[in-house]
């Protein structure tokens, strides 16, 4: 008897512990217990999970949002733990309850789990258990339940009978007309996915009137979500129907009084273009695109500017060049000198992509003048976006033409009297070098990079040093050995001590990317020579450099060449030299 009692106690243990933990004052403990629900369910078995655990969770969970969110997430994966699809209906009550709470993230997760569980029901069980849940949510007093209802239509509709389908369409219409904006917003958000499962006949008779109504809502937050639905609906209809049923509303959205709605149209423009096809694009979308490119709101212009390349790429190939030249480029020219830097930057990130579409002649005639303006723009992002995408143009017109047209502008910027402009070009140089290739770089740009090392502004010299490291990473150590290290080593003999210091700074960073052989053979001898420099600043930088490059030297080299030099510097007459020498000796010993 005692053994029998013990087995009963053991079987009750998981649920008892769960109850205790869920009543604990510590939120973290409650959260952990929810995350272990599947383990507890396995211990209880399917029947007791259905008869004890699920009712307990349904009745007693009123907790912090974090705990409720974890519960909503767990229950979505619980079907197998309650006995499989034929018992999935047991999960509906707790999830329905969670779908009505105040916190949006909890509701959204509950709806996500409800959708998962609903899909696991048989068609018959769906009508018996899930559809009534949906209808209760639709007629709930609080807007929270009605917003959650919107997410369930598309999973229920395809598998129910015709009379129930009619009810669901009527319920959805009711939500589209709800007095609360949050509910209408949720309906607009789910309209597109619902449209995908509704028969074409009812899409036209029921859902498109809902779409038109939502697109005219007095709240712009509802109208902008209707724009997303527009894409889905346009994809589902034949061209004639799109023209008559969707386009009037789309035109209205493109010229909406709220910039947020127009912004959404701009964001979705290429998706809309793909949905409506080339003929409607040519007749209707090109004018709408032009309208948005001239929008009064900079946010809208920036959004549509980022779509210029993709919109043009998806134009009908027969008319593509003609449409770009006559209908798009005149507006793009205006954006090149837009007063807003975000708009100019957005355009600069895509404009080079027009080059392959227009071909060599039109690129030279039409696009290069715009690129030159953008290369000289005061906004660094604009210049960077042009330089970063030069490969598109290079592929079309070739390096020769590109260098003749754009290189003078780059050189001009590299030698600009404003040091910040010079700095910007230095920062773009690795990207530029990568696009133009090593041979071109050596011919046209290497001299510029070396010149920056001798700039009178320290920030430029510092940036130029880091630039050298990035170039070696790009082109490799053998290139560095041939192309730049000899020129840098010459600086160690310059009469101006600042040049000798820059030489040391370069050797510091080059050791990291050139490896042991080059560091030992080429870099170290020059550093050691500068240990006898007459200027104390150079000598203490030798000490710092020796410490910095020591990880890239063999131990025997450190013992034979580095340590004797540092010992000598440690007896220097200058206090700073002695300090940094001692620091280097200690640093190398500790390594």
Swiss-Prot record:
GO terms for biological process: centriole replication; centrosome cycle; chromosome segregation; meiotic sister chromatid cohesion, centromeric; negative regulation of hippo signaling; negative regulation of insulin receptor signaling pathway; negative regulation of smoothened signaling pathway; positive regulation of macroautophagy. The PR65 subunit of protein phosphatase 2A serves as a scaffolding molecule to coordinate the assembly of the catalytic subunit and a variable regulatory B subunit. Key mediator of a quality checkpoint during transcription elongation as part of the Integrator-PP2A (INTAC) complex. Expression varies in tissues throughout development. Highly distributed expression in early embryos. In late embryonal development, found at high levels in nervous system and gonads. In third instar larvae, found in brain, imaginal disks and salivary glands. The keyword Nucleus applies. This is Serine/threonine-protein phosphatase PP2A 65 kDa regulatory subunit. One of its GO terms (molecular function) is protein phosphatase regulator activity. PP2A exists in several trimeric forms, all of which consist of a core composed of a catalytic subunit associated with a 65 kDa regulatory subunit (PR65) (subunit A). The core complex associates with a third, variable subunit (subunit B), which confers distinct properties to the holoenzyme. Interacts with the inorganic phosphate transporter PXo (CG10483). Component of the Integrator-PP2A (INTAC) complex, composed of the Integrator core complex and protein phosphatase 2A subunits mts/PP2A and Pp2A-29B. It comes from Drosophila melanogaster. Belongs to the phosphatase 2A regulatory subunit A family.
């Amino acid at each position: 008897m005692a053994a029998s009692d013990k087995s009963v106690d053991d079987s009750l243990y998981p649920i008892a512990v769960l109850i205790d933990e869920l009543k604990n004052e510590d939120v973290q403990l409650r959260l952990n217990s929810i995350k272990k629900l599947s383990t507890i369910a396995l211990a209880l078995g399917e029947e007791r999970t259905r008869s004890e655990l699920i009712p307990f969770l349904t009745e007693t969970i009123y907790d912090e949002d974090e705990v409720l969110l974890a519960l909503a997430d767990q229950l979505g994966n619980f079907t197998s733990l309650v006995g499989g699809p034929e018992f999935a209906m047991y999960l509906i009550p707790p999830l329905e309850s969670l779908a009505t709470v105040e916190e949006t993230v909890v509701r959204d997760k509950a709806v996500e789990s409800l959708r998962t569980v609903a899909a696991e029901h048989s068609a018959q069980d769906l009508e018996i258990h899930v559809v009534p849940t949906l209808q209760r949510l639709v007629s709930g007093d609080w807007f929270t339940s009605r917003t959650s209802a919107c997410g369930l239509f598309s999973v229920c509709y395809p598998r129910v009978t015709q009379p129930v389908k009619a009810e669901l369409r009527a319920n959805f219409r009711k939500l589209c007309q709800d007095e609360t904006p949050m509910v209408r917003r949720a309906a607009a958000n789910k309209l597109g996915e619902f449209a995908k499962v509704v028969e074409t006949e009812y899409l036209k008779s029921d859902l498109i009137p809902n779409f038109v109504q939502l697109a005219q809502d007095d709240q712009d937050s509802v109208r902008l979500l209707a724009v997303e639905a527009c894409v889905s609906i346009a994809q589902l209809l034949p061209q004639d129907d799109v023209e008559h049923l969707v386009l009037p509303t789309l035109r209205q959205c493109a010229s909406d009084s709220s910039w947020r709605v127009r912004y959404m149209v701009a964001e979705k423009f290429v998706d809309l273009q793909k949905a409506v096809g080339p003929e409607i694009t040519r007749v209707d979308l090109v004018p709408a695109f032009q309208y948005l490119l001239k929008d009064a709101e900079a946010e809208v212009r920036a959004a549509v500017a980022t779509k210029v390349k993709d919109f043009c790429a998806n134009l009908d190939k027969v008319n593509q060049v003609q449409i770009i030249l006559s209908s798009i480029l005149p507006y793009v020219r205006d954006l090149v000198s837009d007063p807003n830097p975000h708009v100019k930057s957005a355009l600069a990130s895509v404009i080079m992509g027009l080059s392959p579409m227009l071909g060599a002649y039109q690129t030279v005639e039409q696009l290069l003048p715009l690129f030159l303006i953008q290369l000289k723009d005061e906004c660094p992002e604009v210049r960077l976006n042009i330089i970063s995408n030069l490969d598109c143009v290079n592929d079309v017109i070739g390096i020769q033409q590109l260098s003749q047209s754009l290189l003078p502008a780059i050189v001009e910027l590299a030698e600009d009297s404003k040091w910040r402009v010079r700095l910007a070009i230095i920062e773009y140089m690795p990207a530029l070098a990568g696009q133009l290739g090593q041979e071109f770089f050596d011919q046209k740009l290497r001299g510029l990079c070396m010149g920056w090392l001798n700039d009178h502004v320290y920030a430029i010299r510092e940036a130029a040093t880091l630039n050298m490291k990035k170039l070696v990473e790009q082109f490799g150590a053998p290139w560095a050995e041939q192309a730049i290290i000899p020129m840098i080593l010459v600086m160690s003999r310059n009469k101006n001590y600042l040049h000798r210091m820059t030489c040391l700074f370069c050797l510091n960073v080059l050791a990291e990317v050139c490896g042991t052989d080059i560091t030992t053979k080429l870099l170290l001898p020059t550093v050691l020579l500068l240990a006898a420099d007459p200027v104390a600043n150079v000598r203490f930088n030798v000490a710092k450099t020796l410490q910095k490059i020591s990880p890239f030297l063999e131990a025997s080299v450190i013992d034979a060449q580095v340590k004797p030099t540092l010992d000598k510097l440690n007896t220097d007459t200058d206090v700073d030299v002695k300090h940094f020498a001692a620091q280097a000796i200690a640093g190398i010993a500790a390594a």
